[in-house]
Amino acid sequence: MIVGYRDFILHYSYKGFHLRACSSNYVWDIGVNEARCSTSPELARDHLASGSCTCGFYAFKGSAQLNKFAPIHGAVLMWGKVVEHEFGYRAEFAQVESLFLPEIAVCQKASHSVNLSDLHVLVDARPIDAFTACSACMEHLFQCAGSYEPWWESFTYDQVLSQLAQNYEVPLIKQIQIKAAYE
């Protein structure tokens, strides 16, 4: 098994908070995630085939390559058919191993840094299953929703991170501890 590092964004549904890939709509499962070929059904039997197939789970080789402004960082275990690239890996199977507190908290609405304790997450609390949460400071929080509606609900970032760590059954690691834990 290989350890890789990746960024996530927050996804909220009636099931609570989950991790979503930054570059696609894929919501990470709790436990093992298996790649499914989306470009060509005939390649589905041969994941990570050469050519145009790009299915699989991507991660960087080191935590230094993570986007410091992404809302969530994590380490993932990768196995099965694995392709190594210059900056990372693409694997047939992956599982979230741990989550990291971000070094810098960023208000997504105004793109300014804030203290992690001042960051809140706004979600649509109606029973829908396709909403990406917006994290922002209190000043800009309800701009995420356009206008305040009674079904919008706000959580502190600490509440969200704790729920994610509990959902995925993984530890929540401070950035300064990453090197000691994995590198």
Where are these regions (language model features)?
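Cys/His-enriched microdomains
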Residues: A35, A105, T132-S135
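ADP-ribosyltransferase catalytic core
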Residues: A44-K109
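Short recognition patches in nucleic-acid-associated and regulatory proteins
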Residues: Q108-R126
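Cysteine-rich micro-motifs
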Residues: V123-F142
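Cys/His-coordinated zinc-binding microdomains
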Residues: P41, Q108-S111, M138-L141
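A structural signal for short, hydrophobic beta-strand segments that form beta-sheets
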Residues: G88-E103, L116-D118, C144-E149, Q159-V160, ...
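Glycine-rich loop/turn
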Residues: D7-Y58, S63-H73
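Residue-level signal for mature regions of secreted extracellular proteins and peptides
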Residues: K15, I30, D46, F100-E103, ...
